[in-house]
From Swiss-Prot:
GO biological process: negative regulation of endopeptidase activity
UniProt KW keywords: Disulfide bond, Protease inhibitor, Serine protease inhibitor
Originating organism: Hyacinthus orientalis (Common hyacinth)
Listed name of the protein: Bowman-Birk type proteinase inhibitor A7
Matching SMART domains: BowB
SUPFAM superfamilies from the UniProt entry: Bowman-Birk inhibitor, BBI (SSF57247)
Keyword Disulfide bond: yes
Length: 70
């Protein structure tokens, strides 16, 4: 599965991969972002240490997309 460039999806500025939804505003990062909870479809979610003390999570594997494969 290939993911188009992030430029045309404003919510995916710092992503490794992004969802393919319409409208573009509905898109979310799949890999590489820190989120309060992992996305639906994230099959491997890892807690990330943050300085703020609030727990954040990052997705390591999203459905069929392996974030570490890049």
């Amino acid at each position: 599965q290939t993911w188009p460039p992030v430029e045309d999806r404003p919510h995916c500025k710092r992503c490794v991969a992004c969802t393919l939804m319409w409208p573009p505003e509905a898109n979310r990062c799949v890999c590489g972002d820190l989120v309060p909870k992992c996305h639906k479809g994230c099959s491997q979610c890892e807690k990330a240490d943050t300085r703020s003390g609030r727990p954040l999570y990052k997705c390591l594997s999203f459905e069929y997309y392996n974030c570490a494969a890049d």
